Regions:
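N-terminal catalytic cores of NTP/NDP-binding nucleotidyl/phosphoryl-transfer enzymes
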Residues: 1-55
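Non-catalytic positions within long, well-ordered alpha-helices that form the structural scaffold/packing
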Residues: 25-26, 60, 87, 91-92
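Receiver (REC) domain switch/active-site residues of two-component response regulators
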Residues: 31, 65, 97
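Generic alpha-helix structural propensity
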Residues: 50-54, 62, 77, 81, ...
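A glycine-rich helix N-cap at a beta->alpha junction
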Residues: 56-71
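Active-site cores that bind ATP or allylic diphosphates and position pyrophosphate for catalysis
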Residues: 69-246
């Protein structure tokens, strides 16, 4: 018996999530999918746009077998603590074989390499990070520069010394995926990470009419009272949600 875990907000649950669950069962041959989901409040302390029971119902109707609530303390925290809490929960359950997550880059070796450095924080990496922070750079920019500095000393990692490193650390799902990998390492978990390449709309794409619509487009449409304009030039009405959400 194989069981895959997913850590998610599902704010809201949409076609991209339904695709992910179906893809997981197809690729891992998993018998069950268990979800650790945020409750009525999500990251940054914002209320979810639909209640936890409705989001759980949608996940179950699209192939998930069990939905557990991630405690609000961690659901509202940063990506690091959000990921750590979900990984700790699945690790203590003792029955999860795979941890699946979406990523803009599904190259596990590259994601693992970065996660390992960020988890171990070698002295030369720490020194470089402190230098860039003292120069006034914000933390994400300083972290990218510190990683480049650290990797430049390792000829075996030349492939990560280009713009690809910036790309890996500038997209939301890659960032969260790296946090999952960090948490697996620090917890000493035996769970196997399994990234799935994101398809359809990018996270920051505001076109709600795309096939696999993602949370950002839906949330932006709600915030703008349905007035955001799609790439086709027409303003979508709320009927388009029927195509974006199960």
């Amino acid at each position: 018996m194989k069981i895959t875990g997913i850590i998610a907000e599902y704010n809201p649950f949409h076609n991209g999530h339904a695709y992910q669950i179906a893809k997981i069962k197809e690729e891992t041959d998993s018998d069950y999918v268990i979800v650790a989901m945020s409750g009525d409040f999500v990251q940054r302390g914002e209320p979810a746009i639909t209640d936890k029971y409705e989001r759980a119902r949608m996940a179950l109707s699209c192939g998930a077998d069990l939905v557990l609530e991630l405690p609000a303390l961690f659901a509202c925290a940063s990506a690091e603590y959000f990921a750590r809490a979900g990984v700790a929960l699945f690790t203590r359950m003792g029955c999860i074989d795979y941890l699946c997550f979406g990523a803009e880059n599904a190259d596990l070796s590259q994601l693992n390499k970065i996660a390992g450095i960020l988890a171990d924080e070698p002295r030369s990496y720490q020194d470089a990070l402190n230098i860039y922070l003292k120069e006034g750079k914000n933390f994400p920019a300083a972290r990218i520069l510190a990683l480049k500095s650290y990797l430049s000393a390792e000829s075996s990692d030349a492939a990560l010394q280009t713009e690809q490193l910036t790309s890996l650390l500038s997209t939301p799902n890659n960032i969260l995926g790296i946090e999952y990998l960090k948490a697996l390492k620090t917890c000493g978990s035996q769970i196997t990470p399994y990234p799935i390449l994101r398809e359809g709309a990018g996270y920051h794409d505001t076109d709600i009419l795309l096939k696999n619509d993602y949370a950002y487009a839906i949330l932006q449409t709600l915030k703008n009272d349905g007035s955001s304009v799609s790439s086709s030039g027409s303003a979508p009405d709320f009927a388009s949600f029927s195509a974006a959400m199960p």
